[in-house]
């Protein structure tokens, strides 16, 4: 028992050290086209306009070729240098009709009014007026099965419960709730011509008879044990958070509002400065990201940062025939704004109807040099080679050869403080630990680990005669030796109120454990003709590639073409990748037991052992990454140690409890 308790206690304490490692991506940035010139007057010319075909964050329906939003920079008298004059920025959006995902016109599921509003989907409470809006929560044609008593989490606190399922009478009794409170219920006859339930509510921003939810019940049937209702078609708006836009409202720096029927225009009453080396907030999450350049160069792009959990599509510009994309018109490709560096391109030629001929689909990428985020040439932090590879950042193991690559894990100039014994999670299972901090001797002993296993360690001298940088070099990485896999710059060591502390400023890391060698006979999806010429990698299709209508056609490594549901003569498509924020987990809650039921788009009849259903729409809040507490400096904030990773306190509690058990058993 003593040995068991001691080993268990040690294991639990080890868990507490790495409890901060579990985290999910907490945001995704989608950018628009890059504008580059000497000043705003040169860039704007007679005026520039960005719409959804250029900016993937704006709403776009590829099937119907529908856009609603534009952002323009006008040629106004106040434009000068890096300053946009009064009224020079115009955001405009207009209500449009779009098809339901569950498209059944004969059942009343044809189209509805939608308005993009600062790159989010909103529904006008009145179909021809843009002043009263509610966010669209879900528009889905997924097939979902509910047993009697089960509750479906739709998103944003809204749920749907199957109160009773009457198979013989072909009826289902559904209840609609918000935050656990009753909203409405209905008995739906499934054998009727229209088995749709429209939930209409009054007094939504002073509007009555507002349709807030639509549910179509496809069928009811008897399962192996339970009576089951199958839903196909759900549409819901967040009516509880609907809003009315007034002419005196302000949205960030856009504060001159004009509402004209189905159109909303908002401009800037004051000048707007594109401050270099910064993100200039415009309104509602829209911003201009501006490069760190000299005063005679101005370079920027429009961006939207999404933080709500979910899967986001990052798309390129829309094409209707032969086309090409690079980082300027496909936000998925790697781009360094400060250095104006891009590496990737994709081209389509030899297009006959909707078929790309052999060798007509070509992906190319080349190695380029970019600055470290921590810029310090004297300490060896100047530039490093990088290559975009299917919209991910990779590092070549040899600076001029594109055949051996490792993914870039981290390139950061954030200030991090480590006390003696503390471990900092770098990502992908890598970590560094401050073994000892010697303030008097101006030294720090760091250890580098992978998945908790020792890799290397070093005593770093922090004195003025040292570059304060630890380069971790490893051998036999894809048969290459002396590969720099980690760079760490220690800024200073100092004594805090209690502990000796090391401050790190500058970390760079590659995922060497998953490095790869690309061979000429490799295949990447439908790209299977590989050519490596020094620092350039070119991959094309040996066979024809069909742009099948109404589909996502995989190109390779997560990149795909989304093709509109149109005749071949009206071909419309774009390249895209997906980025995931948070942890997507919508659930069906069972009445008497835990567990969920799995239902795919191709419905399989569930049995009594089914356990999981995929979520319709994300509602859970993602876990925030937990970093090591830092000693406050001018640019640092001491984190609240009470807000650790979920479960951290539980682990400590279990460790303490087992410690008591161990001591009691030892004394006995």
UniProtKB/Swiss-Prot annotation:
<keyword id="KW-0134">Cell wall</keyword>
<keyword id="KW-0961">Cell wall biogenesis/degradation</keyword>
<feature type="glycosylation site" description="N-linked (GlcNAc...) asparagine">
    <location>
        <position position="617"/>
    </location>
</feature>
<dbReference type="GO" id="GO:0071555">
    <property type="term" value="P:cell wall organization"/>
</dbReference>
<keyword id="KW-1003">Cell membrane</keyword>
<feature type="region of interest" description="Disordered">
    <location>
        <begin position="584"/>
        <end position="650"/>
    </location>
</feature>
<feature type="glycosylation site" description="N-linked (GlcNAc...) asparagine">
    <location>
        <position position="36"/>
    </location>
</feature>
<keyword id="KW-0812">Transmembrane</keyword>
<feature type="glycosylation site" description="N-linked (GlcNAc...) asparagine">
    <location>
        <position position="265"/>
    </location>
</feature>
<keyword id="KW-0472">Membrane</keyword>
<keyword id="KW-0732">Signal</keyword>
<dbReference type="InterPro" id="IPR006457">
    <property type="entry name" value="S_layer-rel_Mac"/>
</dbReference>
<feature type="glycosylation site" description="N-linked (GlcNAc...) asparagine">
    <location>
        <position position="602"/>
    </location>
</feature>
<dbReference type="Pfam" id="PF18204">
    <property type="entry name" value="PGF-CTERM"/>
</dbReference>
<feature type="compositionally biased region" description="Acidic residues">
    <location>
        <begin position="631"/>
        <end position="641"/>
    </location>
</feature>
<protein>
    <recommendedName>
        <fullName>Major S-layer protein</fullName>
    </recommendedName>
</protein>
<feature type="glycosylation site" description="N-linked (GlcNAc...) asparagine">
    <location>
        <position position="111"/>
    </location>
</feature>
<feature type="glycosylation site" description="N-linked (GlcNAc...) asparagine">
    <location>
        <position position="65"/>
    </location>
</feature>
<comment type="function">
    <text>S-layer protein. The S-layer is a paracrystalline mono-layered assembly of proteins which coat the surface of the cell.</text>
</comment>
<keyword id="KW-0964">Secreted</keyword>
<dbReference type="GO" id="GO:0005886">
    <property type="term" value="C:plasma membrane"/>
</dbReference>
<feature type="glycosylation site" description="N-linked (GlcNAc...) asparagine">
    <location>
        <position position="583"/>
    </location>
</feature>
<feature type="transmembrane region" description="Helical">
    <location>
        <begin position="644"/>
        <end position="664"/>
    </location>
</feature>
<feature type="glycosylation site" description="N-linked (GlcNAc...) asparagine">
    <location>
        <position position="635"/>
    </location>
</feature>
<feature type="signal peptide">
    <location>
        <begin position="1"/>
        <end position="24"/>
    </location>
</feature>
<feature type="compositionally biased region" description="Polar residues">
    <location>
        <begin position="596"/>
        <end position="611"/>
    </location>
</feature>
<keyword id="KW-1133">Transmembrane helix</keyword>
<comment type="similarity">
    <text>Belongs to the Methanosarcinales S-layer protein family.</text>
</comment>
<dbReference type="InterPro" id="IPR026371">
    <property type="entry name" value="PGF_CTERM"/>
</dbReference>
<dbReference type="Pfam" id="PF07752">
    <property type="entry name" value="S-layer"/>
</dbReference>
<feature type="glycosylation site" description="N-linked (GlcNAc...) asparagine">
    <location>
        <position position="608"/>
    </location>
</feature>
<feature type="glycosylation site" description="N-linked (GlcNAc...) asparagine">
    <location>
        <position position="596"/>
    </location>
</feature>
<dbReference type="GO" id="GO:0005576">
    <property type="term" value="C:extracellular region"/>
</dbReference>
<keyword id="KW-0325">Glycoprotein</keyword>
<dbReference type="GO" id="GO:0030115">
    <property type="term" value="C:S-layer"/>
</dbReference>
<keyword id="KW-0701">S-layer</keyword>
């Amino acid at each position: 028992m003593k040995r068991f308790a001691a080993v268990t206690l040690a294991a639990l304490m080890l868990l507490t050290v790495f409890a901060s490692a579990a985290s999910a991506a907490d945001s995704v940035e989608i950018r628009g086209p890059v504008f580059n010139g000497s000043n705003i007057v040169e860039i704007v010319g007679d005026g520039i306009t960005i719409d959804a075909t250029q900016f993937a964050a704006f709403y776009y329906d590829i099937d119907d070729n529908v856009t609603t939003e534009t952002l323009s920079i006008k040629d106004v008298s106040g434009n000068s240098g890096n300053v946009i004059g009064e009224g020079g920025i115009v955001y405009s959006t207009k209500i449009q009709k779009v098809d339901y995902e569950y498209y059944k016109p004969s059942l009343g599921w044809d189209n509805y009014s939608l308005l993009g509003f600062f790159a989010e989907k909103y529904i006008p409470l009145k179909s021809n007026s843009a002043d009263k809006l509610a966010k669209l929560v879900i528009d889905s044609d997924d097939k979902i099965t509910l047993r009697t008593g089960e509750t479906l989490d739709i998103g944003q606190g809204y749920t749907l419960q199957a109160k009773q399922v009457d198979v013989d009478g072909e009826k289902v009794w559904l209840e609609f709730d918000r935050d656990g409170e009753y909203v409405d219920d209905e008995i739906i006859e499934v054998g009727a011509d229209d088995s749709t339930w429209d939930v209409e509510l009054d007094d939504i921003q002073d509007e009555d008879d507002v349709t807030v939810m639509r549910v179509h019940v496809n069928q009811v049937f008897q399962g192996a044990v339970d009576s089951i209702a199958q839903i196909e078609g759900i549409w819901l708006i967040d009516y509880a958070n609907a809003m009315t836009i007034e002419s005196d409202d302000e949205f960030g720096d856009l504060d001159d509002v004009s509402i004209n029927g189905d159109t909303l225009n908002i401009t800037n009453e004051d000048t707007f400065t594109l401050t270099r080396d910064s993100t200039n907030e415009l309104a509602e999450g829209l911003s201009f990201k501006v490069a760190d350049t000299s005063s005679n160069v101005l370079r920027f792009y429009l961006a939207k940062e999404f933080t709500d959990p979910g899967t986001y599509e990052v798309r390129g510009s829309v094409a209707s025939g032969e086309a090409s994309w690079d980082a300027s018109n496909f936000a998925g490709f790697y781009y360094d704004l400060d250095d104006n560096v891009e590496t990737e391109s994709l081209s389509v030629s030899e297009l006959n109807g909707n078929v790309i001929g052999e060798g007509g689909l070509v992906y190319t990428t080349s190695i380029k040099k970019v600055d470290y985020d921590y810029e310090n040439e004297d300490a060896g932090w100047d530039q490093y080679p990088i290559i975009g590879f299917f919209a991910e950042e990779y590092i070549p193991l040899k600076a001029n050869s594109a055949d051996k690559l490792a993914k870039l894990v981290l390139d950061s100039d954030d200030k991090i403080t480590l006390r003696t014994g503390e471990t900092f999670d770098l990502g992908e299972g890598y970590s560094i630990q401050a073994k000892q901090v010697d303030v008097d001797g101006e030294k720090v002993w760091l250890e580098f680990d992978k998945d908790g296993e020792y890799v290397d360690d070093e005593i770093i001298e922090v004195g003025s005669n040292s570059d304060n940088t630890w380069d971790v070099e490893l051998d036999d990485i894809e048969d290459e030796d002396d590969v720099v896999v980690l760079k760490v710059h220690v800024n200073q060591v100092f004594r805090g109120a209690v502990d000796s502390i090391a401050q790190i400023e500058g970390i760079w890391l590659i995922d060497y454990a998953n490095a790869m060698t690309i061979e000429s006979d490799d295949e990447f999806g439908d790209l299977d003709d590989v050519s490596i010429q020094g620092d350039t990698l070119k991959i094309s299709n040996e066979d024809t590639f069909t742009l099948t209508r109404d589909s996502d056609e995989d190109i390779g490594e997560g990149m795909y073409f989304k093709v509109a549901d149109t005749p071949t003569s009206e071909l419309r498509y774009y390249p895209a990748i997906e980025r995931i924020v948070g942890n997507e987990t919508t659930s069906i809650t069972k009445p008497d037991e835990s567990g969920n039921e799995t239902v795919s788009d191709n419905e399989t009849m569930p049995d009594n052992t089914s356990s999981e259903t995929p979520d319709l729409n994300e509602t859970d809040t993602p876990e925030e990454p937990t970093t090591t507490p830092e000693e406050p400096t001018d640019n640092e904030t001491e984190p609240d140690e009470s807000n650790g990773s979920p479960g951290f306190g539980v682990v400590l509690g279990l460790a303490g409890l087992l410690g008591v058990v161990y001591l009691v058993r030892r004394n006995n």
